[in-house]
Curated annotation (Swiss-Prot):
The gene is rnc. The lineage of its organism: Bacteria, Bacillati, Bacillota, Bacilli, Lactobacillales. It comes from Streptococcus thermophilus (strain ATCC BAA-250 / LMG 18311). This is Ribonuclease 3. It catalyses: Endonucleolytic cleavage to 5'-phosphomonoester. GO terms for biological process: mRNA processing; regulation of gene expression; rRNA processing; tRNA processing. InterPro entries: dsRBD_dom (IPR014720), RNase_III (IPR011907), RNase_III_dom (IPR000999), RNase_III_sf (IPR036389). Signal peptide: none annotated.
Amino acid sequence: MFKKKGCFMNQLEQKLEQDFGIVFSQKDLLETAFTHTSYANEHRLLNISHNERLEFLGDAALQLVISVYLYNRYPNKPEGEMSKMRSTIVREESLAGFTKACGFEQYIRLGKGEEKSGGRERATILGDLWEAFLGALYLDQGLPAVEKFLNQVMIPQVEKGNFDRVIDYKTALQERLQVNGKVDITYTVIDESGPAHAKEFTMQVAVDGKELSTGLGKSKKLAEQAAAKSALEQLGN
């Protein structure tokens, strides 16, 4: 999206400072965090680093911070329940949702092929970006900075019960169903109820013309997400 390195870095640094109060000392870490392997591979002669190693580190930092949060927040929950909660919070689709909620997806550097194939919207890439950013933040400023950022962005959504709103279930369902080839996924309103100011929609999701699941929502978009979520649950996601 950004053709010039200076433009990409300047706008990213400005956003981080304005939106989150984060200022990186080691600019190279930030640049690496937002560089996908496809971009690095297309510029091999420049010896550009990609974000996979930072992703590995960020995953560990994320797991630790969320584990501590759950341990303190739910003193009476057994280990098994906390593990399930953590898995839901750090799942790929939710991390991709937080990446988009923060507007980070527009700054990732992708190879031309990856860009053309829709990589900027791919949950796998966006989830990896989130972890890579956390890894870079950890190396630059330590675990307290990672914890502060997550408490600012992720934890409030869990506390408010708005967590599902961050997860893009439609994208997750599409990627799940298209693993073995392209399929036709359609969403159709099959029922509307309630007064004009408080309507509720029933949405059907179908795959290649066959109904897979339905979902309810106070808007068509929310109903689509609910239908996709229900479909994923049926598929055992």
